[in-house]
Amino acid sequence: MFIATVIVSVMLAVALTFSAIGKLTKNPSVIPMLEQVGVPADKIPWLAYAELLGAVGLLVGLAVWPIGVAAAVGVILYFVGAVAAHLRAKDKDFAPAAGLAVFAIVALVLRVLSA
């Protein structure tokens, strides 16, 4: 079970890191979508920092399970918020955020079961 936890946590941490890099480097394929769902430009770096903290928490959480649980819960809430932002803006392109939310739920369940 712990091997599955490591695989899922590392994959999610990598996805979060790449997403954060896209925001911090103002990737032209990322920023317009964020603005379309109503994220103010000055808040975009804070979303990236939250993603990076989630990634670090998931990785540290492999050694200290309560941190992993807290990080997974935070990542779930982050992506639930992302899905809500898409729905509020009537943007139908929320599948990536929803998929990552499900992935974070899997990470949480695995971390709890392998604690």
Language model segments and positions:
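Membrane-interface extramembranous regions
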Residues: 1-115
